[in-house]
Structure formats: structure tokens, C-alpha cells
Amino acid sequence: MTLRSLADIRARAADRKGGEAALAALLPTMKTAAELAAIPDDRWLSMMSRCVFQAGFSWKVVETKWPGTEAAFWDFSPARCRAMSDEEFDALLKDSRIIRNGAKVRSVQNNAALVMDLSAEYGSVGKAVGAWPADDFIGLLDLLKKRGDRLGGGAGMMALRFIGRDGWVTSPDMVKALVAEGVMDGNHDSQKSRKAIQAAFSQWSAEHGTPFAHISRILAMSVD
């Protein structure tokens, strides 16, 4: 794939944001594989759940309710959430501490099962995510989509970003930039486009070792 250099794209983004220093200050800090591996499984379930609840809803409301949500879901203990009874599910739908959306409440139980399964397979969710190769980030997204509940698309990508795993987020501005760079058409969910995004990010990252998360933000900030 013939791509414009990341340096050129970064220069455009820097011009739009007031200079290189201003741009650099807007780039996220990502965790190492060892740091990700050290994150307990309950914090992974908490972040997954938070991003599921935020999807299509006011993030400010979710943030305000989150301490109560943590308490209502037993501090997101995977084993406890997985064992949620029908009676407890019904009680949660009446609990004013949380956002009472039945499908999202049920996703906590289902994603607790995912967390426990990954922990059994890899030693912990953090070990699984931290060791996942960068050149197969789409494979990690596929895992969340296929084996998780409501973790396809934005929720899964945002959970990984917020917890510190390097990767991209297909925000509207980043998609616009990828289309402008000729990487893909507007349908970023197709298998063809996802493979093209992976190839482009791997190529750009190879130029100077730039993390995917930085490339993602640089692209998003390079367009009007």
C-alpha cells in the first residue's frame, strides 16, 4: 500500500493544533504489556461495563453514577457478576444507583464470563490483552466482538483505549482522514476496510515506532 508518510500527516495535524508541542500534549499515554498484565480482572470488567453503559448515553451521567454502579455490581467481581441470579437481575433493574437498561445489565454478567474465560486461558485478561500482537489488533477487536456482549465497535475500542492498550478508535474524524488518505472507503466496519486499516497502521508505525493510539489521534486531528 502506497501511503503518505506519517510525518507529513503529523505536520498537518500540528499546524491545525498550534504546533508540535500542542499536538504532543493531546496524544494519549499507553501502558506497557507488563503494566496491562498487572491490572486485576475486576478492573477490566469494570472498564468494559463502563464503556457499554456509555454507548449511546450521556458520559457525564454514567460518570456521576459510576461509584454507585461499582457497588451495585459487587465491585465488578467477575465470579460474583457471572453468578448473578434472575432475582438479582430483577433487583438491579429497580436500583436507582445504576442506569437501568436490561440489555446492558445483562452484558455485565456475560462479559464476566468472558473475563473469567480469558483469565483461565491466558492467566489474566491483562496478560491476554498485553501480549496480543500489534499487527493483529483487528484480531483482538474480533475477540471482544465475538466472545463479548456489546463489545463490538466503539465500546470495545474505547475500553481498550481508556485502560491503556495501544490501538485505534474509529472516530468519525479518524475515518474521514483514512478515506482522505485512500486507505478505505467510508465503511470502516467491512472486513476489507478493517484489514486495510490494520495494514496502514502497521506501515505508519514502522516508520518511527509510533504507537497506534498516537497515529489514531494524529489522523483525527489532521482533518477539518
Model-derived regions: residue spans:
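Alpha-helical ds-nucleic-acid-binding substructure associated with the helix-hairpin-helix region
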Residues: 74-150
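C-terminal accessory module of base-excision DNA glycosylases/AP lyases that mediates lesion recognition
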Residues: 1-29, 129-224
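Alpha-helix N-cap and coil->helix boundary residues
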Residues: 61-64, 83-84, 120, 169-173, ...
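Non-catalytic, well-ordered alpha-helical scaffold segments
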Residues: 42-46, 67, 102-109, 138, ...
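N-terminal polyanion-binding entry modules of DNA glycosylases/AP lyases
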Residues: 1-101, 105, 218-224
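Short coil/turn segments at secondary-structure boundaries
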Residues: 64, 106, 121-127, 213-220
